[in-house]
């Protein structure tokens, strides 16, 4: 389990680095073809309500999200830093790994002091594809009461 946890830690660090560098093509590569990616509030998640800020079902929707960011979205330039801690393996069953970690995203807009943009936890189900671990399901459950600016870059 220690080796798996170390492998997960590396995966989470690589994921955060890809987003911090705005390498959205690399971000797509972290998911299985049949993935689910959601950004959902703690309130909606804990009450079992389906409404999410972002929901992608399948790699096609993940790629569409990237295309929208690149081609149609208009947003203020920003720098983000994704900090991940508390990586835990919750279990392994049938080749699917259940894992979790905490995240904090700091955001620096061009003319403002940095601030915490979002804090929460990742609830993940991962599968091995070849030698790589990939997200079959990534739930980004944020604790914020509200989103201060805009949610452009994936969580």
Residue ranges and their predicted role:
Residues 1-33, 40:
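Short, low-complexity N-terminal intrinsically disordered segments enriched in polar/charged residues
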Residues 15-17, 70-77, 110-111:
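Short helix-to-loop capping/linker segments positioned immediately adjacent to catalytic or ligand/cofactor-binding
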Residues 33-102:
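A solvent-exposed, acidic/Ser-Thr-rich amphipathic alpha-helical stretch
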Residues 79-83, 88-155:
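A beta-strand edge to alpha-helix "cap/lid" segment located at domain peripheries
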Residues 15, 27, 62, 99, ...:
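Hydrophobic pocket/interface hotspot
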């Amino acid at each position: 389990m220690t080796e798996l946890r170390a492998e997960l830690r590396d995966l989470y660090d690589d994921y955060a680095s890809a987003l911090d560098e705005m390498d959205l093509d690399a971000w797509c590569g972290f998911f299985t073809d049949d993935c689910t990616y959601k950004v959902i509030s703690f309130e909606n998640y804990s009450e079992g309500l389906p409404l999410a800020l972002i929901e992608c079902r399948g790699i096609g929707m993940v790629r569409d999200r990237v295309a929208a960011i690149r081609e149609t979205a208009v947003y203020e330039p920003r720098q983000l830093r994704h900090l991940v801690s508390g990586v835990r393996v919750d279990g392994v069953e049938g080749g699917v790994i259940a894992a979790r970690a905490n995240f904090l995203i700091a955001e620096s807009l061009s003319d403002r002091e940095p601030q915490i943009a979002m804090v929460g936890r990742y609830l993940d189900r991962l599968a091995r594809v070849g030698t790589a671990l990939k997200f079959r399901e990534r739930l980004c459950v944020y604790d914020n009461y509200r989103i201060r600016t805009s949610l452009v870059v994936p969580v």
